[in-house]
Regions:
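Structural signature of extracellular immunoglobulin-like
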Residues: 24-28, 37-42, 74-84, 122-128, ...
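Conserved aromatic anchor
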Residues: 19-31, 64, 112-134
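Proline-enriched interdomain boundary motifs that mark the N-terminal boundary
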Residues: 4-13, 102-112
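Short beta-strand segments within Ig-like beta-sandwich modules, predominantly Fibronectin type-III
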Residues: 17, 52-60, 149-157, 188
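N-terminal Sec-dependent signal peptide, specifically the hydrophobic helical h-region
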Residues: 1-11, 34-44, 49
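Extracellular fibronectin type III
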Residues: 84-104, 180-202
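Hydrophobic loop/turn residues within beta-sheet-rich immunoglobulin-like superfamily modules
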Residues: 17, 28, 67-69, 165-167, ...
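Beta-strand-rich modules
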Residues: 57, 61-90, 160-185
């Protein structure tokens, strides 16, 4: 039975990073004893709630099961607190769509090779791309001076040149990924930490 004495979980939210998602919430305070939690999900227009593999768990989070890995699905989640025969009201999340609601991290810079007039940069995307993904890498770069001028370029390959540079000069760059999503918009990732490399002497 639903109990007015057992409050529903608060701060219920989906945390999603690089398409790895979990439901989390704040612990429900009780005077004595322990509380467990049960979480459900439903997708799209279906009215049926399904278990997430988190029934009567003491944890205050629940990872998405594999069937919820579809990026374009609209998902609603709910969680309640339970204590013995008592259950709280359900607390619901707003609709979640991974393709627009996830946070993309920075790409990984694997290698940088310096020549006199360019830097050859090798990167990896922050998540495992799916077939058909269109990814771009936005590169901001600048000479490491007191008043630098930032330049930008956009690349679709994971190996690219930053060109037209001066020899034996320190240049810095930061890279962020853009994923083209269904609506034609781009989901922008977090920029990588700036790193600096000196071009070679000719």
């Amino acid at each position: 039975e639903t109990s007015p004495y057992l409050p529903a979980p608060k701060n219920v939210e989906v945390f999603s990073y690089n398409f790895q998602s979990l439901l989390r919430w704040s612990p429900v305070p009780v005077e004595n004893g322990s509380v467990v939690y049960t979480a459900h999900y439903k997708t799209g227009f279906y009215d049926t709630w399904s278990g997430m593999g988190c029934a009567q768990t003491p944890q205050t989070w629940c990872g998405f099961p594999p069937e919820l890995r579809r990026r374009r699905w609209t998902i609603v989640l709910r969680v309640r607190a339970e204590r013995g025969a008592l259950a709280s009201a359900w607390a619901h999340t707003p609709p979640f769509v991974a393709e627009t609601n996830t946070t993309l991290g920075p790409p990984r810079v694997n290698n940088v090779n310096a020549s006199p007039d360019s830097l050859l940069v090798s990167v990896s995307p922050p998540f495992t791309p799916e077939p058909g993904d269109i990814l771009q890498y936005l590169v901001s770069y600048w000479e490491n001076t007191t008043s630098p001028t930032e330049k930008k370029l956009s690349e679709s390959n994971t190996l690219f040149h930053i060109g037209n540079l001066k020899e034996s000069t320190l240049y810095c760059f930061s890279i962020q990924v853009q994923l083209k999503i269904y609506s034609g918009h781009f989901l922008e990732g977090q920029p990588s930490a700036p790193e600096c490399h000196r071009t070679a002497l000719s």
